[in-house]
Amino acid sequence: MNNLDLSLYLVTNNSEDEEKFLNIIEESLKGGVSVVQLREKKAETLDFYNLALKVKEITQKYNVPLIINDRIDIALAIDADGVHVGQSDMPAKTARSMIGEDKILGVSAANIKEAKKAQRESADYIGVGAVYPTNTKDDATSVPKKELKEIVKSVDIPVVAIGGITQENAHELNDCGIDGLSVVSAIMEAKNPKIASENLLKEFKAKNS
């Protein structure tokens, strides 16, 4: 997938207050978020489907790709831009055969072996983490900075770092060679999602200037 801007990659969290949830996404897009991944691990299928349609309406307005976490059925049903799968989700190779060559396929990896396998199975990018402690995912594997650098060097596809990234620590990843910052709480729980997005993007752009 060419020209995929992964600079600031938003992964959503729980959407209990739908109006607030959709507003956060829109504000983050105004602040420069370049990809949105809709992640709903507990939602009923119909609720997820309806929410995904609403989120897609917003992302299309800003010409930003919408990725669905894990649920290939939802991604296909709403014609999302792609799917992201973890190590315990549908195998990447199977996901690719289901979504076709034109959709974006992202894969989570926590080590070089997983990253290389994802590349072989035609992933368009890899999400590596958790680079910092995170409350979003209880079972997240910790990936030291040294390991992150080695993963980046081991593959030819883009890598985004995820896990506990904030405006305060993002600069610590400056020399890792990553293609983007993937965040959840730093935007979803920010008082001002637009400004939070702008600041995170500034941190990332600063290291790439």
Curated annotation (Swiss-Prot):
Report the Gene3D superfamilies cross-referenced here: Aldolase class I
Specify the enzyme's EC class, one word: transferase
Annotated pathway? Cofactor biosynthesis; thiamine diphosphate biosynthesis; thiamine phosphate from 4-amino-2-methyl-5-diphosphomethylpyrimidine and 4-methyl-5-(2-phosphoethyl)-thiazole: step 1/1
GO CC annotations? Answer: cytoplasm
CDD domains linked: TMP_TenI
Q: Indicate which residues the UniProt annotation says bind Mg(2+).
A: 70, 89
Catalysed reactions, as listed in the record = 2-[(2R,5Z)-2-carboxy-4-methylthiazol-5(2H)-ylidene]ethyl phosphate + 4-amino-2-methyl-5-(diphosphooxymethyl)pyrimidine + 2 H(+) = thiamine phosphate + CO2 + diphosphate; 2-(2-carboxy-4-methylthiazol-5-yl)ethyl phosphate + 4-amino-2-methyl-5-(diphosphooxymethyl)pyrimidine + 2 H(+) = thiamine phosphate + CO2 + diphosphate; 4-methyl-5-(2-phosphooxyethyl)-thiazole + 4-amino-2-methyl-5-(diphosphooxymethyl)pyrimidine + H(+) = thiamine phosphate + diphosphate
Q: What EC number(s) does its UniProt record assign?
A: 2.5.1.3
The record, for HAMAP family, names: TMP_synthase (MF_00097)
Annotated protein name in UniProt: Thiamine-phosphate synthase
Taxonomy, top ranks, is: Archaea, Methanobacteriati, Methanobacteriota, Methanomada group, Methanobacteria
Gene name, per UniProt, is thiE
